[in-house]
Amino acid sequence: MQSLTPQDPRAIGAYRLLGRVGAGGMGQVYLARSDRGRTVAIKLVRGELAEQQEFRDRFRHEVRAARQVGSAWTAPVLDADTEAAVPWVATGYVAGPSLQATVTGPRTPVGVASGAYGPLPERSVHILGSGLTHALQAIHSAGLVHRDLKPSNILLTIDGPRVIDFGIARALHTVSDGGVTRTGALVGSPGFMSPEQVRGERVTPACDVFCLGSVLAYASTGRLPFGTSDSGAHAQMFRIAQEDPDLTGVPVGLVELISDCLRKDPAARPTTDELLERLADSDTAEPWLPGALIAQLGRHAVELLDSEDPEDPEDYPIAPAQTAQTAPVPDPTPPTPPSPTTAATAATAAPTHVPAPAPGYGYPQQPYQPQQHQHQQPGFGPTPPYGPAYP
């Protein structure tokens, strides 16, 4: 985790910022904590995007839909202000490294991993697939298609995987960096896109099933089933659309399932219900990850608890807010077994005092009026969170 800079706000909404955990096409992501101790990840939209009405409309719609996703397999959207001068959204902060960092490299949202573990054992991949399928079911039930399911958007915890950045990244779909609307724009990561995404066709939940197949092949082997982009992204996308996947090294027990997910025809791919039947695993008594990874996750949790509050925020800026969009979300129903162990998390209240914006920060120079936030109180809570990846 990086320290806050003098240009960063020290509070957003009801949350005090602790540090930077990354940045992406949509904006900066911060680790934050409420006055009652709940840790969240807050994504603050880039200023130039906040000025585009088309983006704001899509962002508002996607956040509203994403708030309806209730699953123990996702990092839930907890709070948001889509009407602020600079919109933001807060999600659960998941205590675990990304699948990408675990399998092939030390890069994690907070940069604390000392190295990669390598490909996961077959049983771990089997349970990973089950958890991800549960997450996709919840996302699809809310009327969303993730469209960017990839290893950096999957976080590993002691009691199962968590999917992050569902739905919200779609707000960038028709908005380019220059503010020009672009039709048929590609959304996704080249190595983990579906053929219909590559061709610019309409995407459906079957798109996420294809991406799931690519993710499981990667988790099993440490390699992408359609090769890397070393020869160019266009060559890689051609292979996705036209060639068979390379499943060398995938355990025999997973080859057929992954092959079915990677069918070119969306209609020929299994549904999430069919996948759950094939991924059913009654052996849940033992930890789902190897011992070395379990130990690493424990260290991550300790580091999160040891996080200290930053310096006094009184002399630093705060991201301006207007009308908070924080309608409570009904308690979700946890997934059917195998499901992770979850714990209820308490609702947090808005602070009684928030510092005024500092001159020169680049936001409107107006007094800050604290908003009354109604925080959801889900009936579950993923392990106290640790770092979403970013679209």
Protein language model annotation of sequence segments:
Residues 1-313:
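Eukaryotic protein kinase
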